[in-house]
């Protein structure tokens, strides 16, 4: 959201976004199912329109509003992992330990989004946001890494695919189509991933 953006109307931006989601999922040509449940630890009643949406904001300079939408199933969330590693622990080793445990529930081949640093919450958000970037691992392979995050991307892409998990966990050469890594400064005592 640009700092100079003015939104007209009597609704909050969240309410406007949720109205857009509601209209999209209730549109006669929509082929995506409604999967959001209210009262998740109680009645688990389907909202029938996938609202309320999970909304994250970044306030940036400018006068434009950009909205990225990710309509996704539950597998990507169900297989999410978080760890507060020791600063000396290897992110590569941790990822290579976690991916085989995920089974086929994340519907490979897919993309891995890895957030490193900040706080627990920030690391998870970095991972999710990184998945909005285009698949470009082959371009990165061609030009070579320019920083530690890109080195991690290349190393994990090679090593995760070498696990042989393959499509739908049935074995094969391609488990990930790309690996995204985003990092953020963190406290010296921690390495949230």
Predicted regions and their residues:
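Conserved phosphate/anionic-ligand binding catalytic regions in large, soluble enzymes, centered on
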Residues: 1-7, 105-125, 185-193
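Flexible, glycine/charged-enriched surface loops at secondary-structure junctions
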Residues: 26-39, 101-113, 138-149, 163-178
């Amino acid at each position: 959201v640009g700092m100079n953006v003015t939104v007209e109307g009597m609704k909050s931006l969240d309410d406007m976004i949720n109205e857009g989601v509601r209209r999209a999922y209730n549109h006669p040509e929509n082929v995506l199912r409604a999967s959001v449940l209210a009262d998740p630890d109680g009645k688990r009643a389907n909202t029938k329109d996938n609202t309320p949406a999970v909304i994250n904001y970044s306030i940036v300079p400018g006068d434009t509003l950009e909205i990225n939408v990710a309509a996704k199933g539950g597998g990507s969330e169900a297989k999410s992992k978080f760890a507060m590693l020791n600063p000396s622990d290897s992110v590569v080793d941790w990822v290579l330990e976690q991916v085989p445990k995920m089974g086929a529930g994340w519907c490979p081949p897919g993309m891995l989004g890895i957030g490193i640093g900040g706080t627990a919450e920030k690391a998870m958000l970095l991972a999710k946001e990184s998945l909005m970037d285009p698949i470009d691992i082959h371009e990165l392979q061609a030009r070579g890494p320019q920083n530690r995050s890109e080195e991690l991307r290349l190393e994990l892409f090679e090593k995760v695919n070498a696990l042989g998990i393959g499509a739908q966990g049935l074995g094969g050469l391609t488990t990930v189509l790309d690996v995204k890594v985003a990092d953020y400064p963190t406290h010296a005592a921690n390495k949230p991933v």
